[in-house]
């Protein structure tokens, strides 16, 4: 699933409260002007907020310390992060992006400091947790923020003359720092940020478990309401309403019949009819941590062709899971799933009809993050990694089948967050 790597975050400033997925991320199937009555089964849903434990200040301190260790290993004096997901990861603050530079510097040694437009300082200080560092260096509208970024790193101590830029930092900022601080080499900070964020703690996995549980609860409430003549938009709106009743922002992409063969759907309005394949791909987030679940069913009795392809897809998903062992490469998981589909006569590699994309992606604070089950990825499976497992069989002009469940790697190997579909008639295990 991908809408700009399907970021499960808003762009408004937030404090340590929950990030929330916007149902607009799935808006290609939703019609905000539709006011269909919400089915009673959805109205009866109760919030699933009890027992949610946010990430602690102590854990965020440990993340910063790990980032500083990785900077030393990578020979980086400090990294700059805009007010996006990595800012939330390390400090609990999400600011967003505009044409005005705002962000934070994590130095290899010393406390975090922030770079902020002067007129935004009061708002920034409302959101900043001073336990991580309370220094805010401000720039007026006619001044350069880039010298402030370099200045923080210089003042904390320079050893390698290298400044790391987090992957979401825009070019004009990185280039601005390069121009005002020519003595520094500008480098990629992904080995630091991904080196931290890829490996989830027990607390993070617990939050992801909740977001997956909520998604399944929403699906289980809504799927029985599917009927002949229902529009794609009505089904999508029902899913959004179910998430809301459960206390979360969420939604799903819905694609029907031949449009289910398009992995990320179509803008064409669709209506459900008896015998159609219906693919629902969506999720929510809990304290920012995402779920991503796909279920594919048929309204009414499936044809033998639909049943055979569904069962093949399930076999491919099972093969991927069976291939996941601590120490094996991520590409080997993709190979396992793809081999099942190819052996049934479907296209080699990414050719259609067949599996047109990787078998799975990393997931955490973003719906798509490091690392992927894909050819060429030699990253080794290790505890703390989290992935989607979603081989997909696309048959253009006919239909597509995708089953998607996310999983985490424990010390003893892989564990699904959700029960897999048992059959085309039993999508919830």
Regions found by a protein language model. Give the residues of each.
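Active-site neighborhoods and metal-handling regions in enzymes and metal-associated proteins
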Residues: 2-429
């Amino acid at each position: 699933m991908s809408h700009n790597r399907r970021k499960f975050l808003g762009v408004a400033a937030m404090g340590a409260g929950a990030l929330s997925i916007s149902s607009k991320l799935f808006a290609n199937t939703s019609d905000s002007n539709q006011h269909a009555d919400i089915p009673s089964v959805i109205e009866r849903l109760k919030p699933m907020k009890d027992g949610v434990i946010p990430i602690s200040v102590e854990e965020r301190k440990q993340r910063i310390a790990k980032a500083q260790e990785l900077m030393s290993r990578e020979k980086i004096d400090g990294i700059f992060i805009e007010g996006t997901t990595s800012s939330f990861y390390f400090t609990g603050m999400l600011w967003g992006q505009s044409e005005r530079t705002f962000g934070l510097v994590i130095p290899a040694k010393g406390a975090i400091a922030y770079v902020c437009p002067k007129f935004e300082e009061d708002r920034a200080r409302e959101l900043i947790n001073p336990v991580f560092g309370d220094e805010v260096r401000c720039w007026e509208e006619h001044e350069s923020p880039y010298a402030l970024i370099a200045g923080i790193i210089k003042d904390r101590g320079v050893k390698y003359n290298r400044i790391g830029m987090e992957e979401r930092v825009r070019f004009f900022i990185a280039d601005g720092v390069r121009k005002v601080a020519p003595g520094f080499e500008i480098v990629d900070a992904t080995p630091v940020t991904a080196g931290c964020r890829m490996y989830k703690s027990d607390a993070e996995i617990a939050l992801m478990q909740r977001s997956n549980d909520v998604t399944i609860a929403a699906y289980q409430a809504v799927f029985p309401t599917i009927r002949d003549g229902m529009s794609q938009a009505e089904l999508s709106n029902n899913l959004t309403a179910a998430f809301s009743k459960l206390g979360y922002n969420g939604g799903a992409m819905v694609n029907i019949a031949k449009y289910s063969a398009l992995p990320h759907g179509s803008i064409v309005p669709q209506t459900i009819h008896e015998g159609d394949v219906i693919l629902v791909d969506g999720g929510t987030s809990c304290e920012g941590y995402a779920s991503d679940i796909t279920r594919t069913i048929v309204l009414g009795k499936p044809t033998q062709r639909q049943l055979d392809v569904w069962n093949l897809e399930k076999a491919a998903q099972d093969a991927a899971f069976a291939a996941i062992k601590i120490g094996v490469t991520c590409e080997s998981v993709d190979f396992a799933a793809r081999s099942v589909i190819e052996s049934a006569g479907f296209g080699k590699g990414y050719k259609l009809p067949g599996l047109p994309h990787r078998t799975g992606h990393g997931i955490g604070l973003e719906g798509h993050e490091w690392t992927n089950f894909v050819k060429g990825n030699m990253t080794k499976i290790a505890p703390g990694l989290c992935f989607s497992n979603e081989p997909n069989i696309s048959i253009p002009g006919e239909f597509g089948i995708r089953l998607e469940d996310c999983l985490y790697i424990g010390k003893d190997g892989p564990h699904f967050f959700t029960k897999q579909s048992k059959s085309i008639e039993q999508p919830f295990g």
